[in-house]
């Protein structure tokens, strides 16, 4: 769950600059198989979760981490009264789930949508967003969809897949944009809901129409 209005735009830029490095996950996954990917992702995810545990239960470590990256953390991450996962932990959990659940092509696209669409939607939505759409801005959600279609087309070409595949993953992007806009009120972290919805809808369409993936 995120509310992008809770930190300054400059800090949002810095946060998303770090966030985009997660694109290394689908790029590297393109060149390796699922077991290898999971053997890398699972330990890294455990490390991020352990760091969150230290932040919550160890006051000295919490003070140190807040001093280093506190300006990039959202209020619900800083002012925690219960165990709260940071954005990095949610991204890593999402990566493991996406790679584990979905076929490789769909997983790569679903995770790319999470990283790129969420980033551009947040930045554009905060900069020019004026029209409310669920809990976000219409401008941000349209940016999410446009970037998503570009992502889907690019990966479809890389995978040498057909038009049905492109339509399926683009439809998944459409529903992911809606889910992202509603994630805050649904009390679901958008880092989880975006790839699960994008990948799930895409896979269902391809399964129903017996499409290639």
List PLM regions with ranges.
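Short alpha-helical "patches" and their helix-cap loops
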Residues: 41-45
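Central hydrophobic cores of alpha-helical transmembrane segments in multi-pass inner-membrane proteins
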Residues: 47-50
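Interhelical loop and helix-boundary elements at the membrane-water interface
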Residues: 1-40, 53-155, 163-213
